[in-house]
Curated annotation (Swiss-Prot):
Keywords: ATP-binding, Cytoplasm, Kinase, Nucleotide-binding, Transferase. InterPro entries: GK/Ca_channel_bsu (IPR008145), Guanylate_kin-like_dom (IPR008144), Guanylate_kinase (IPR017665), Guanylate_kinase_CS (IPR020590), P-loop_NTPase (IPR027417). It comes from Shewanella frigidimarina (strain NCIMB 400). The keyword Nucleus does not apply. This is Guanylate kinase. One of its GO terms (molecular function) is ATP binding. Its EC number is 2.7.4.8. Essential for recycling GMP and indirectly, cGMP. Residues 5-184 form the Guanylate kinase-like domain. The keyword Chloroplast does not apply. Residues 30-49 are annotated as: Disordered. The lineage of its organism: Bacteria, Pseudomonadati, Pseudomonadota, Gammaproteobacteria, Alteromonadales. Gene3D superfamilies: Guanylate Kinase phosphate binding domain, P-loop containing nucleotide triphosphate hydrolases.
Length: 207
């Protein structure tokens, strides 16, 4: 008997390595876990594919979906809207697939109100200096944008205590191992195993 998938909320300030950790994690047994593809009104970055990285839509389309109550969470970040489809999340979890939401603390708060079993993971950088170095190293943003992201990072990180797990991404491989351990542990909880191993447990306890 297969068990329902777990919903993981993964948050971090921009530049902490959250997206890299999630994408690397998904390369291992991608059939049992996937990242939720959010809707957004921002323009695609180089290399991003519509429907794979995000569903890129207009502001008008996004507001129409809000009116339809189609999102489990949505937020405005740096002047752009981001949202996560309710229906897609539920259908995926019912298939026994773990789902990862790459969202900020505001979105996490909304999701937790609707799905109390969601598991929060916050990724922290080892220092502000390292975070700024990573943002600068991308070569994508102006100094003004980087300064704005650094200010936003402090605000984002102040909400770390709202999450069940904290990972410091000082060493990428260690951070990846920590994230993998969290996911594995949730598959081994009593509630999950009671469902997944029901037939075996019934047989073991039979007279």
């Amino acid at each position: 008997m297969s068990t329902r998938g777990n919903l993981f909320i993964v948050s971090a300030p921009s530049g902490a390595g959250k997206s890299s950790l999630i994408s690397t994690l998904l390369k291992d047994k991608p059939s049992d876990k996937q990242v939720s593809v959010s809707h957004t009104t921002r323009k695609p970055r180089p290399g991003e594919v519509d429907g794979q990285h995000y569903h890129f839509i207009t502001v008008e389309q996004f507001k129409a979906l809000i009116a339809q109550n189609a999102f489990i969470e949505w937020a405005e970040v740096f002047g752009n809207f981001y949202g996560t489809s309710k229906l897609v999340i539920e259908q995926t979890l019912d298939k026994g697939i773990d789902v990862f939401l790459d969202i900020d603390w505001q979105g996490a708060e909304q999701v937790k109100k609707l799905m109390e079993t969601a598991i929060g993971v916050f990724i922290l950088p080892p220092s502000k200096a390292e975070l700024e170095r990573r943002l600068t190293g991308r070569g994508q943003d102006s100094q003004q944008v980087i300064d704005s992201r650094m200010a936003q990072a402090v605000s984002e990180m102040s909400h770390y205590a709202q999450y069940e797990f904290i990972i410091v991404n000082d060493d990428f491989d260690n951070a990846l191992a920590d994230l993998s351990a969290i996911i594995r542990s949730q598959r081994l909880t009593c509630a999950s195993q009671q469902h997944a191993q029901n037939d075996m447990i019934v047989d073991l306890l039979a007279d």
